[in-house]
Each structure stands twice: as C-alpha cells, then as structure tokens.
Amino acid sequence: MVTLVTGGTGFVGANIVKHLADNGHNVVSFDINGPDKLLEDFVGQASSPVAFIQGDIVDPESVARLGLDYQIDKIVHAAVYTVNREALEIERSRDVIAINLEGTANLLELARTQQTKRFIYVSSGAAYGSALPSDQTLNEETPPVPENLYGITKFASEMITRRYGQLHGLSTATVRLSTPYGPMERVTGHRAVMSVFHDWTGRVARGEGITTEDMDDGRDYIYIADIADGLRTVLDSPNLPHNLYNLTTGIWLTLQEILDGIIELSPSTQVTTPPAKLAVAAGGNYSRGPLSSHRLFSDLGWTPSYDLKAGLTDYLKWRTESGYLD
C-alpha cells in the first residue's frame, strides 16, 4: 500500500513527501518535474525510500497508469499552479484552469477506481479571497469570495472534491493552508514568486544586507514542517468530524516582526530602509485576515510546533547545511 503525493517536487509537496516517509508511509511522488539534487538530498534523509514518478496530472492516462503500477491507499493532492500576480494570471489563464481543475478531477477519478481510504485536497487561504476585512479571523464557516483564478480554482476544486466523495463513497477532506515558509521554497515551473522569508534568509545566508519594505504589511505565516505534520494528522485520522480544515498558526506576523526575528538570530546583518515612497509591500496587496486553527485543534488535537523563532532557526540551519543560497 502506498500514499500518493502529487506535486511532490514542489515546495509544499516536497515537505509532505519527506514527512510522510519519516512517519511510516510508503510514498510515491507524482510531478511534472523530476527531483533535482537539492530535493534528492532533502528527501534522501527520510526514514523510508520515496519513488519519484514524472508525469502530468492533466493527462488522464498518466494518472490512471499510477493505479496499475501501485496499490494506492491514500492520496494527498498538492499539485497546483500558483499564480499570485495578475500579469502571470493573464498570461497563463488556461494553464491555471487546466492544472488546478482538470488535474483535480483526474486524481479524484483515480481515487474512485482505487477506492482509496483517504483523499486530501491541499487548498489555500486564497479560497477566502482578499475582500474580507483584514481584522477578521476566518474560520471554515466564513463564506469564500475568491477573486483571482488561483483562488477561484482552489475553491472550485474543494467543492468538486467534496461532491466526488459523496457520490462515490470516498473519505475526502480539504485542508486550507495559510502562507508557508521554510526549506525547499525555490523557483519552479509552477511557482515563480518567492516569499519574504526566502528573500531575507537568502540574504543572511549569503552575508548580504536586507532592504526593508512596507514593514506594517503581514500575513499569517506558518512553518512548512507544521504544514506537513498537520496534513499527516488529517490524512491518518481514523475519523474526520469535518471535511474542511484550516491549517495555520492563527498568528498574524508583520514584516517588522519577521525582520526582528532574523536580526535576533543574525545580529551582524545590515538593514537598509529606503525612502517611504520607494517601499513596496512584499507579495503585493494582501488584505485578508488570519485563518482560525480552532477546528483542527478541537477535532484532532493538532497544534503547531514552531513559533517564529523556532521556524527561523530551523530554516537558517537548513540553508547553511544544504548550501542553498539562492
């Protein structure tokens, strides 16, 4: 019996693959990209071997072939086209829809034919949209109002996943992630814009200074190891009282708080503050409030293990030990 992880060579997927392999799962990764040296070294430290299969989730025959080659017990569908800039959304509109919707349908059909024990759809806080008040904490009962193609396709895939499960007797669940940071974030074919954590920790690792931006801007960041652990908790739980969970720390972090945390760990790092008129908010406009983690704690007892200092410490250690300086 194996656990299939789509998008297993990407940022979130790579961490899911390693964490599951470290916790008793026989993992098969399915991704349009093969593993690079950085990923091989990262996953190579896992307790169980991982099979990397290269293929396209949009191709139904390639997806169906997985069911012939492996006895698939559980699926974590993390493959996605991440679009967080309107220019890229305009340029790749068809790709976003094909990958995020057709790919999900193909994986659900595989789950149906294999009668998997659990299908997890990895969604995003983007499903809520950004039009909601920034001081409003968003729980799973908050009505989603996504505006861009990324958020729209994530929410649509959630609904498709739920209905497919109802129609075909599958145990399905959606997990909405808040904003991740940590090891294995890098530019890939489906992820082009990096987080401020990636930028600033990279500068520290290279011995460069940091140029600040709009320091009041922020997000509800969560360390990637906590995301992997939270997803495994939902995946392996014998019973799920709900089919939708937020996965988050529930804590809003401003850029100033992140910078303070980095400087505490690397006091020699030089900081430059440009004139206010030149400052640009990291990651673009982002006005939604933090997600609530109450349901995941109440139902399954899950809580995050990493606060900001612990996450930054672990991330900087990985950058140093892996030699990843980009």
Protein language model features and the residues they cover:
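N-terminal Rossmann NAD(P)H-binding glycine-rich loop of SDR-like oxidoreductase domains
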Residues: 3-23
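Substrate-binding strand-loop-helix patch
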Residues: 188-194, 215-228, 244-264, 306, ...
